[in-house]
Amino acid sequence: MNTRFPSSKMVPFHFPPSKLALWNPMPIGECIYLHLSYYRKPKLMVTEKAIRLAYRHAKQNKKNVPCFLLGSLTVDEDEEGVTLTIDRFDPGREIPECLERTPTASLPGDFLIPCRVHIQGLGSRDVIVHNADDFSSALKALQYHVCSKDFLDCGKLLCLRAQITPRESLDGVDFNLQWTAVTLANSFKCVPVKPIPIIPTALARNLSSNLNISQVQGTYKHGYITMDETRKLLLLLQSDPKVSSLPLVGIWLAGIIHVYSPQVWACCLRYMFSSSIQERVFSESGNFIIVLYSLTHKEPEFYECLPCESRTPDLQFQLLTNKETLHLFNNVEPSGKNPIHFELSAESQDAEAEAEVLSKISKTLPVKRSSQKLSPGKIPINKHDTDLEDEDFSPRPIPSPHPVSQKISKVQPSVPELSLVLDNNFTESSNQSNPLEMMTVENPLLIKPSQPELCDAKHSSEATTGEPFRRGPTNQLSQDTALRQSRGKQSSTCKKESLQFRNTNAKPSLSVPSPDVAEKLQAVSAGSMQKEDYPVRPSTLDSRQPSLAPQAQPHNLVFSTHNSTRPMELQVPTPSLPSYYPTNVCSCCQHHGHIQYSTINSWQGNTVGSIQDLRSESLPKHAFFHSSGCPSLCPNAIYSSSSPVSMKQGGMGAYSPHSNGEPSPVAGPSHVDSCVPHPCAMCMHTPNTAPDNGMMGLSPDAYRFVTEQDRQLRLLQAQIQRLLEAQSLDPGSHKTVATVEDTVKAAKQMELVSMEAQSSPGLHMRKSVSIAVSTGASLFWNAAGDDQEPDSQPKQDDTKISSEDMNFSVDINNEATSLPGSASSLKAVDIPSFEESNLAVEEVNQPLPESNSSSEQSKEPGVPVFFPNALLAESVSMCLQTAPTEGASNSTELPQGTKDEPYRPSDNQKIYQDLLGQVNHLLSNASQETEEPPTKAVVTNRECAKTQNTHHARKKRHNSGLVDKDCVLSATIKQLRSLGVKIDSPTKVKKNEQKVDHASVLACISPEAVISGLNYMSFGNVGMSSLSPTGVDLSMEANAIALKYLSENQLSQLSLARSKQNNGDSSVGLLHINSDRSTVGLSLVSPSNMSFATKKYMKRYGLLQSSDNSEDEEEPPSHADSESDHVLNRNPACRPVQCGHEKEPSWNACEIAQCSDCGSADTRTDVPVLRNITNQAVQPRATEHLNEDSAISLRNLKPNPAMNLRTGKAEFTHHPEKENERDIAVFPGTLPSPETLKQMNSMDSVGTFLDVKRLRQLPKLF
């Protein structure tokens, strides 16, 4: 084995005998300084979610226990600084053997920040960020990491602590955040020198290659350098055991671009203070070598590095602080994409005091000084040598470099040992003065600065002069920080100027009041602020900040200066709001519990709807302003435009684009005076701020948004006014305009606020509807009260208009129709609102009021109207109009809701009123014909003329005489207007009849007879969307059922049939009624997927094919057919009505008459009739003479591709199998065979069943 040395020609390695002139020290470039914060201050990026979680945790735990914020520290891309991202919260946990709380879910590489949240609202003097123990533990942790052999992490060279003091304000929470970090103050300067030869070892060749070890591992690498006798450099890994025995001359790094990277600084600290290095060899001037394998250079770079302090430096520490006040709004989702930015700064007037405090504590630390050369037997006992490689693989000369005492020191951690020494020394050194008092005097940044609550600027000036050292610099720092944070990502020129001003004029500016300091810092602002105005309007100082730099905070919060928050926090007589946005709210507004600064949404590009929804969430708690309130006395258009008070009658907001800080006239009409008191005298002398050229101190984007918002509001209110005027001219309308008193009374009726009552914001209701199904009680109203309903409804049902949205809907749900017999079903279907709106309104879900019941008419465009009994069900068809492609009824649209209808003419009101008046007219006669069991209403889209003819046919059949159409029409209009429904005009029908979107003739079917647990909404959209590609086929629940029971082939078949039918004649498809008793909209449901009981149940009611399809039917086959012919022959109301260029008679009127006659025929046997829910298959004779013009029964509306899901026509289904326990005839007798239907329309009977592409995007409900 010994012969290998001569064969390999290896010679013993020796350091140069002379330690002089080891390399050429001639500089070839400029000097570069190394420090963590030399080029850029450390940045903090804190997510709003983490702060909210810490605040919530502190409120729940009254003990004020410490918690933790977790994040990660990364080096910036340009390597000029570091960024700490704090995005998690950890409540911490207690460990029995540990005195302090530890995080519960800390991961390797996490940056741990101890945090305390003071909920009690302590004063500024009582809030201490660091105490003695905190400082000592932080310094020991820094020393340990620098001296150990652990992996070098820049994040462990920065010990950060947080202090959060929340204070609840009117619309959110003010957070006073104090960040205090301790880091090492040792810095280095390095100068590039000429290259030095390197021994070409495997490590050196790897580092010089294109794919070195740092690039493979994706992280930077560093190690140490020694030298041989020829003065060539030998590179060693950090973990090489020879590091502890060889003289070292410097360090090498790879995977780094620039030498000023914080990672290079950390490696220099490790080289200077590592306890595992026995001997360091410096040049004559005390320099060492840095070899940098840069990612951007092919050859290594050589630098000569010198500690800036001294040749044998000690560990020095530096304090970095930041104090900010931010405001987070209530009821706003935290924005995770835009964190809050902070900067840790060491530039302050208290640098000397901080250095003195830290030096006193650091003197207690033992071995801090690194020796140039230490003999192997004199390695410090507290060496942090935890790597076992030294014991296992290091060379073992005699005497051994690992004595017994050293091994013992490795077993016992050195941190507790240091802790004992440090605590004793610190206690002794602080016996002369109280530690808290010492830190208060010598290092005010350790304690939140005190700011007395003053009532005038004179006292403020005196107090500031009396406390020059403590208060002055801190005010400047907070002013500078607030200004810097308010600028966002803009240039930091002003920041640097203010810093320069603060540093150069430090001492003279100590006695200057902070408002004046802010005036100097805000030299860009042109206004002058009088001192006597400061106590009254502290936010005036902050209100001019946007003129210095526009505020465009995307994270729903605004920083305010430290001064502006103090009066609000503790001083009750003269409170003030911090300038969350430049709102200039007067000091008497402290009681406005519901002032909503809606600008938080405007910065995100949200629309009026979202702002109003935000208001509607938080404002109902305070229905009206406090009596001492004085809101909206500011030129801020954003606040005024969305404030409940500012939206006065006539659309004139309480602001003007050119108000320039003057108080806006808030005192409106007399009906608003009760809600909005006159401003107090203190508020009326608002000083003018800096001239803003009519932009009210806003950024251009914000001002544009406010202008557009104002324009839209004015347009909306003008349209509402026109609608109200048209309604007031209508003789059939009992009540046209709602007053404030009416609005208050109608708050329980889910009525929206009219524009005269806009000062009561608590009435903005949810635009959704709950529809009762699956209970017998919910299928019909109380028949006994039908006669009284038309008389009582006009008294209760006041139509009201809300300017909070540019949308309109109808709500005929009131206390008169909410009878005891119409309680909502437990199986209600909530249909969300999908508006067609270019504003992209995102609504907030709100519960429906208690008065909501099954009789409520939908606010949705796709929810039908339901009728109380069989009389209505047989002959009433609604003339419904919706937004485009919704296929749903729009008789539900009235100027009191929230549908986007700024462009719909006012002549819709007449048709709506005619429609609902006819309904109420039928309701009034309902109790006279109780011999016929209730079935359900057939809801169709058809013309008003058809409605009148159908009603005429019904009156002829039941009363054996014709009723004058004019009488019927007048009664219909009267009743409809009493309920506030407006009926579309025939001219609008003709205008839109070119584009047929949706039509459906939905007959009666028992949902529970199809599939157990299925309500009527499951088939509300069956076969309605094949006419237009913009349609949606099924409701979500039916889609889910189809996905559950249909195979892939069947789904593909349906999609193919749908695509084929889209190219065919849509009018033909309208007239098809599926006669196959096994389908009922589910013709492809496979019996193999059902249980035996389900199959038997469905076969019994003709829902599946069986050997005897009529085994459970009681009617003869030709019964319904003959009745249908009879109705068609004898009922003139079913005759076709020619309309414009249309050639075909309407099928709907005849279908209504036919269904009515069938119902009367069924009455003889007391068996309710179930009819097919689909509208695809057609009866041949109906096709022959009614095939040409089904378009007359459709509403033509503009296609809306934005609609992704619309509810279709739904049935109000009576459940006879539950209520009368009778067998049910599922369909009328003789209907064409499935073969005939297939010949007529190929696969159209199921072609519009569903759209597979959209179906797969909907959630499965089963």
UniProtKB/Swiss-Prot annotation:
The keyword Zinc-finger does not apply. Residues 1-992 are annotated as: Interaction with RBM14. One of its GO terms (cellular component) is cytoplasm. Its main location: cytoplasm. Residues 949-959 have a biased composition (Basic residues). It is found in: Cytoplasm, Cytosol; Cytoplasm, Cytoskeleton, Microtubule organizing center, Centrosome, Centriole; Cytoplasm, Cell cortex. The modification Phosphoserine is found at S733, S760, S1110. Residues 473-493, 500-512, 540-551, 883-895 have a biased composition (Polar residues). Residues 220-762 are annotated as: Interaction with CPAP. Residues 567-760 are annotated as: PIN1-binding. Disruption phenotype: Death during embryonic development between days 8.5 and 10.5. Embryos are reduced in size and display delayed development. They have axial midline defects, and randomized cardiac looping. The midline sonic hedgehog signaling is blocked in these mice. It comes from the Eukaryota. Ubiquitinated. Phosphorylated following the activation of the mitotic checkpoint. GO terms for biological process: apoptotic process; centrosome duplication; determination of left/right symmetry; embryonic axis specification; floor plate development; forebrain development; heart looping; in utero embryonic development. Ubiquitously expressed in adult and fetal tissues. Highly expressed in hematopoietic tissues such as thymus, bone marrow and spleen. Residues 792-803, 1116-1128 have a biased composition (Basic and acidic residues). Keywords: Cytoplasm, Cytoskeleton, Developmental protein, Phosphoprotein, Ubl conjugation. Residues 369-409, 454-551, 650-670, 782-804, 883-904, 925-959, 1106-1129 are annotated as: Disordered. Immediate-early gene. Plays an important role in embryonic development as well as in cellular growth and proliferation; its long-term silencing affects cell survival and cell cycle distribution as well as decreases CDK1 activity correlated with reduced phosphorylation of CDK1. Plays a role as a positive regulator of the sonic hedgehog pathway, acting downstream of PTCH1. Plays an important role in the regulation of centriole duplication. Required for the onset of procentriole formation and proper mitotic progression. Homodimer. Interacts with PIN1 via its WW domain. This interaction is dependent on Stil mitotic phosphorylation. Interacts with CPAP. Interacts with RBM14 and this interaction interferes with the interaction of STIL with CPAP. Forms a complex with CPAP and SASS6. nteracts (via N-terminus) with CEP85; this interaction is essential for efficient centriolar targeting of STIL and subsequent PLK4 activation. This is SCL-interrupting locus protein homolog. It comes from Mus musculus (Mouse). The gene is Stil.
